[in-house]
Amino acid sequence: DNMGAIFRNAAAFGADAVIMDRTCCDPLYRKAIRVSVGAALKVPFARGDSAGAVVDALEAQRFQVLALSPAGKQAIEDIERAPRSALLLGAEGPGLPEALLSRLPSVRIPMRVDFDSLNVATAAAIALHRLWRP
């Protein structure tokens, strides 16, 4: 469900691609395609060996890579948007590994103090909307 929703969000907010590591589920799985309302067939995607390798490749191409986490150091609305940005999402539950959070600028979506997290696809939609430029 999350993979399909992430592709749907990527299409809605004009993401150029979705890049995954080997731990991500198949976006061409029937349920992911259905949840994405076909966006998984339209938004280009690629796979890297690991999240670290994906980040290395993006940084080599001069992307601003932002790690989205409830524990992010900066509110997403305070981020200076770069011409080329990539948003790194973690798995539902464990989130992003500490090694990546300490390496990258981390951003959070501010929420009420008595609530600490959102579904990964919902968080992706909010963050993509914030970073999207028409």
Predicted segments — roles?
Residues 9-13, 26-40, 98-134:
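Structured adenosyl-cofactor binding patch, chiefly the S-adenosyl-L-methionine
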